[in-house]
Amino acid sequence: MERGELVARLREEGTVLASLPGSGWGLFRTPAELVIARNVSEVEPAFRALEVWTGRGGYAAGFVSYEAAAAFDPCMETHVPEGFPLLAFAFYESPPEELALPDCGDGVFVSALQPEWSEEEYRERIAAVRAELFAGNIYQANLTFRCRAPLTVEPEALFLSLLSHHPVPFAAWVNFCGVKLLSLSPELFLESDGTRI
């Protein structure tokens, strides 16, 4: 598939491009249904719907945000960004179209990243995490913050370019529910083996 054709497909609402086991790629298009959880009480029913859909032989692709943690452990403190789903999955009738990615190494990058935290805020939050670790209240923490930058290219082209320059084993492009999510990860966070996630 040519780069232009792939970018056009990624623009379509309901599209998910994800790395498949091995070295291939799968492109999902035209979902039969979307399941979205915007608050903690909707997370468990969304997972039940996911289980029913895939149990009937359907396919699903989507994301679970870190902020969904409170649905599994009410003690987890999270800060949900306004308007961003805790969980969103698209349900598909057919398996993904398998494809090879075209060369997209054209050097499209984001410049002028502006962190949402000042250096002082960053140091304060690191100190707070360290204090919790030393007190034995936690054994690990995911401390992340957003950076913002003006986007001078289409997000689809940015994803393909980043992937060309930074290949990772687990990557995905998600385009539904008003979200265009670019994910390039060296690790797998969730995996199912029959009855267990």
Predicted features along the sequence, with ranges:
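Extended alpha-helical targeting/anchoring segments
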Residues: 1-197
